[in-house]
A protein has these predicted regions:
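Serine-hydrolase catalytic-loop signature spanning alpha/beta hydrolases and amidase-signature enzymes
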Residues: 49-57, 68
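Catalytic histidine-centered segment of alpha/beta-hydrolase-like enzymes
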Residues: 274-287
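Active-site machinery of serine-nucleophile hydrolases
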Residues: 63-72
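Structural cue for short, hydrophobic secondary-structure segments
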Residues: 44-47, 70
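Active-site glycine-rich loops that stabilize anionic/oxyanionic intermediates
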Residues: 47-50, 116
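Flexible "cap/lid" subdomain of the alpha/beta-hydrolase fold that forms the substrate-access gate
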Residues: 2-29, 34-37, 41, 69, ...
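Alpha/beta-hydrolase active-site loop signature
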Residues: 49, 74-77, 143, 275-278
């Protein structure tokens, strides 16, 4: 019998996470914010099948030393396009809104955490505003052709031939079953993943509209066309970079993480024995690695 249980220390000033909305270019951008505003900022960008909710455990940890801001991208979570605004769901447009959001928030310099769809949004911010980026953490946020698995075959076909039939073939990626699969595939113990993660994500897809997600899947090919420009940014600016990757991601291969070192030799690469949504199963490891990396790279 253990007579010396580990003690639990409750901080004198526990981190409070604020939930706010900011109107930007006809979009009501919902975001989570925590930490001292005068501390170095970390901007968290989620991906497909998710929202800022995926950072619910990470934010309080980072906010002990950093100012943390996590918006929901247009088309996801609690962010809403205002009536009559009109909106083209492309990655250029998503990035323009998030860029305007950072300006409205007064985020002059920030470290980026990018995941999945958040990566092409974040890459555009970095390429267009290299002076604002203090560091990069990529958690299964792809930037290289070799990082794309065979799971992209249907998308590649639709990019090459954007017919109505090829577009319709992408609809299956937006079902509840597929969303759940993206959370659980490659995970050793699926009981670690709370079911509300994929349920909330799918509810948002249905509320906002499946066609929005179809538009983004079709537009993803344009991100690959911009890789050369992104690699030039990496070579020229050498931002402190940590690629921390679920090694059994069905869409983004480990080779995509290793490739960061080609253009940025000082990039740090780490692998976790899990799938795409590594933060759901290895959140503590990611938080610890991020804090150590950010402390080395930008201080607090």
């Amino acid at each position: 019998m253990n007579t010396n249980p580990a003690s639990v220390t409750i901080p004198d000033n526990p981190v409070q996470v604020h939930h706010r909305t900011l109107d930007v270019e006809g979009v009501g951008v919902f975001y989570r914010e925590a930490g001292a505003p005068d501390a170095p900022t970390v901007l968290l960008l989620h991906g497909f099948g998710a929202s800022s909710y995926m950072f619910r455990a990470l934010i309080p940890v980072l906010a002990q030393r950093y100012h943390v801001v996590a918006p929901d991208l247009p088309g996801f979570g609690q962010t809403d396009v205002l009536p009559g605004a009109g909106f083209d769901y492309t990655f250029d447009r998503l990035a323009a809104v998030i860029d305007a959001f950072t300006v409205a928030k007064g985020l002059d310099r920030y470290a980026l955490y990018v995941f999945d769809y958040g990566a092409p949004v974040g890459w555009r911010l970095a390429v267009n505003n290299p002076h604002k980026i203090t560091a990069i953490v990529s958690q299964n946020g792809n930037a290289y052709e070799e990082g794309l698995s065979a799971g992209w075959a249907d998308m590649r076909k639709a990019w090459a031939e954007p017919t109505a039939a090829n577009r319709e073939a992408l609809r299956r990626f937006n079902t509840l079953e597929m969303t759940k699969w993206q959370y659980t595939e490659g995970v050793n113990d699926a009981s670690l993943i709370a079911p509300e993660t994929w349920q909330l994500a799918h509810a948002a897809i249905e509320r906002i509209g499946v066609e929005v997600q179809m538009d983004l899947l079709l537009d993803y090919g344009h991100n690959i066309q911009q890789y050369a420009q992104l690699h030039d940014y990496f070579r020229r600016h050498q931002p402190p970079t940590l690629a921390i990757w679920g090694s059994k991601d069905p869409f983004f291969l480990p080779a995509g993480a290793e490739a960061f070192k080609r253009d940025n030799p000082q990039a740090e690469v780490r692998f976790l024995d899990t799938g795409h949504f590594a933060i759901e199963t290895h959140g503590a490891e990611i938080a610890a690695a991020m804090l150590a990396f950010l402390d080395r790279s930008i201080g607090s």
